[in-house]
């Protein structure tokens, strides 16, 4: 596996983990509230290169103590979200 393939795989894993953790933390699925997921919960270091790439792709934003999934992804299904990430990585 090349370095680029490893990075791509890691990026997808982090994106999906962020998506799942966000869904679990939301108290009300119809709520517009997007929780902050800590670096520890996401299991990444501050300013991890994959996280910065996801930020550049518009998937997340940084907060003082972690990251937040962008609002437009909060109501997507898991399959829709995975497809979005896949398409963005191919661009």
Annotated model-derived regions:
Residues 55-65:
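A short, conserved structural fragment
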Residues 21-25, 57, 87:
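Surface-exposed polar/charged interaction patches
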Residues 72-91:
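Short, amphipathic alpha-helical interaction segments positioned at domain boundaries
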């Amino acid at each position: 596996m090349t370095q680029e393939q490893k990075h791509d795989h890691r990026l997808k894993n982090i994106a999906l983990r962020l998506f799942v953790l966000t869904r679990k933390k939301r108290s009300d699925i119809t709520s517009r509230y997007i929780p902050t997921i800590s670096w520890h919960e996401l299991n990444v270091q501050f300013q991890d290169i994959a996280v910065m790439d996801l930020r550049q792709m518009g998937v997340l934003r940084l907060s003082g103590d972690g990251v937040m999934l962008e609002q437009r992804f909060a109501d997507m299904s898991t399959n829709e979200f995975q497809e979005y990430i896949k398409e963005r990585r191919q661009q």
